[in-house]
């Protein structure tokens, strides 16, 4: 597994995103299939993946606890935990709630420190909440206490908002949504440039846009397969992101062993995109964008809907129909 350096620490180019573990039905609810998910984590660890990204609310709050249990068999200093303070859940809470959540996260993860701690899902409104709660001072205080090693932000908004935040607070790293579709569609290019200009390492989420860039439609996929028959469609998305020198690690929410093995193959002995590869990818993107898909990653941050609409499910069905033409 390729590594990139962060403050003299080797960080795996592939990071394990712990929001999309395999699940199974249990008492009418979808719960993490712990046996299958642990196999994935064990395989990733054995292959050199050392960055594990979770959050307070992932898998209905089950992700952190499962991750802590699954990783306790390994030396704590051999891997990094990344988790997040859920700013978006704290609109009506006071500062004391941050302490409760942080203590709960340490307990769930079975650790006395968190390597990478982020303010979660911050947009323009969340930025105001951060200021009101004193959340930035809180995470820096935890860093001073030795309970957090590095502080960052998980960002969801425009480059203009990101620039305002970076002008206000200093972060050790920043996590953004970046992939070859959002490079222009959501101006991830400018967000990345802002970080590069300031020398801030970039952690990437949604490199395959919730799985949409792992399949594309048959015409766009055919362009990529013709150019590199041995490579998966998803590998093009991972290589696009990994070709950016300011990227520290690429988070992928791997649900199956095939997905994990494909990413391991792509990012072990990584080969950057050539000029010819970029031309091929641009052709495929042009074909794919003509389909008129809805740019939804399936993150579920829009839920719950006040009138009960299953928004991500409906978007997913629409996109599948649009891409496959109901074949």
Residues of each region from the PLM?
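A short, structured active-site edge motif that brings together acidic residues
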Residues: 77-90, 119-120
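Glycine/proline-rich, positively charged
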Residues: 24-25, 32, 90-208, 215-222, ...
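Short beta->alpha linker loops
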Residues: 58, 62, 156-157, 255
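Short catalytic-loop micro-motif centered on adjacent basic/acidic residues
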Residues: 51-57, 149-153, 175-176, 249-251
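Alpha-helix-loop-beta-strand connector modules within alpha/beta enzyme cores
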Residues: 64-83, 136-146, 197
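Conserved, mostly hydrophobic/aromatic
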Residues: 14-16, 44, 52, 67, ...
């Amino acid at each position: 597994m390729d590594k990139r350096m962060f403050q003299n620490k080797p960080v795996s180019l592939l990071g394990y995103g712990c929001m999309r573990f395999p699940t199974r039905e249990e008492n009418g609810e979808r719960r993490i299939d712990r046996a299958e998910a642990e196999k994935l984590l064990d395989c990733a660890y054995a292959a050199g993946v050392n960055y594990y990204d979770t959050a307070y609310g992932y898998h209905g709050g089950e992700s952190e606890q499962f991750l802590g249990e699954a990783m306790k068999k390994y030396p704590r200093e051999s891997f990094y935990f990344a988790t997040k303070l859920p700013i978006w859940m704290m609109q009506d809470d006071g500062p004391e709630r941050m302490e409760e959540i942080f203590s709960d996260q340490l307990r769930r993860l079975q650790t006395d420190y968190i390597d990478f701690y982020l303010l979660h899902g911050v947009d323009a409104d969340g930025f105001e909440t951060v200021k009101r709660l004193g959340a930035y001072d809180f995470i820096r205080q935890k860093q001073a206490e030795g309970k957090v090693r590095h502080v960052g932000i998980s960002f969801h908004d425009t480059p203009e908002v990101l620039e305002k935040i970076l002008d206000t607070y200093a972060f050790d790293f920043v996590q953004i949504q970046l992939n070859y579709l959002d490079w222009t569609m959501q101006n991830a290019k400018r967000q990345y440039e802002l970080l590069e200009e300031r020398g801030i390492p970039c952690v990437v989420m949604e490199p395959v846009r919730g799985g949409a860039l792992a399949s594309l439609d048959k015409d766009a996929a055919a362009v990529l397969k013709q150019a590199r028959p041995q490579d998966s469609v998803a590998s093009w998305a991972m290589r696009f992101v990994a070709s950016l020198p300011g990227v520290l690690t690429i988070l992928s929410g791997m649900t199956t062993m095939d997905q994990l093995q494909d990413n391991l193959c792509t990012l072990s002995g990584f080969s950057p995109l050539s000029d010819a590869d970029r031309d091929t990818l641009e052709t495929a993107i042009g074909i794919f964008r003509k389909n008129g898909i809805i740019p939804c990653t399936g993150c579920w941050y829009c839920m719950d809907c006040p009138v009960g609409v299953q928004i991500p499910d409906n978007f997913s069905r629409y996109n599948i129909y649009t891409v496959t033409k109901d074949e």
